[in-house]
Amino acid sequence: MTHYLLAVHGPAEMEEFGNYGSREEMEEAFAATAAFNDKLRAEGYWVFGGGLQSASGATVVDGQGETPVMTDGPYLETKEAIGGFWVIEAPDLEVALRLAAEGSKACRGKVEVRPFDGLA
């Protein structure tokens, strides 16, 4: 089994209801995402998952020099950012892509699928 990152992309800066048009739409997406999370757990794919706060609250840490440098804000200035993610364990890419499509429908966002490069 391989671990995959399913990264949900959305606007870097969130509006009042995230990337949803209304509170109702946001609540529907959250409920659908919770049901999808339950499915991942029940079927044994779930490793970890979560939503992220706005990219403007990020801090970039560069510890390559003698003294770490910490910079407020996202690493890259961009219109989109990762708003949440799942780490799943799946037998192959085909299954990971199928699950990503289900997750995309549930959260109403684009999902990028990337296999992990081995396990640490």
What residue ranges belong to the model's regions?
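Conserved, structured core segments of small domains
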Residues: 1-120
